[in-house]
């Protein structure tokens, strides 16, 4: 039979194992010379995307399914947090040949 001290230690270890949070990542996606880089990226719900526009004109990151629509001013960075899992095709509304895919895990 386990002692009270041993049971308390086991309970604390079990709670500690459950309380370890997953760390959200910050992922940088760059728009430069009319190209989105990387063209394919993986992330998780809760991660932050840093949309970096290095061009001298505005761009957007517009999800084809409507999940997000971010406008990034020239030479600026915009951050957004991912809230929904799925594979999202997105593009720049101003420059429709700029396309990429973001795969978001739960």
Regions found by a protein language model. Give the residues of each.
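Extracytoplasmic copper-binding redox domains, predominantly the cupredoxin/blue-copper superfamily
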Residues: 2-4, 13-14, 19-106
